[in-house]
Amino acid sequence: MKRSGLITTKIGMTRLYDDAGAAHAVTVLAVGDCTVIGNRTADKNGYIANIVGMREAKAKHIAKPQAVAAEKAGVKPFRKVVEFRVSDDCIIPAGTALSAEHFVAGQFVDVQATSKGKGFQGAMKR
């Protein structure tokens, strides 16, 4: 069973202590206003996926193809749009809002991230 994911923003890091008093580093993530925009089906697209959007955008800030796709789906345009491949029993209807309640306590998750670009740093000095 492959479930849909969420788009989040990293807030920072902190530590949590277990019962033995050992500290564990944890990353704090903010779950934004994620909404399912649409779905990909095996019949039409060859794979099954949920299309999730985060942070509503003004019409002037998005490309015309994205605006047309959002209008067809009946949702507002979003700044960040991501597809999550899922199994056929985990398709979420378009227009459904996703939140942190999507997960249960103690559940393991896979995380993907984009690191901040630092540009060309030049030659290393001694």
Question: For the regions a protein language model found, what residue spans apply to each?
Answer:
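Extended basic (Lys/Arg/His-rich) segments that typically form rRNA-contacting surfaces
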Residues: M1-R126
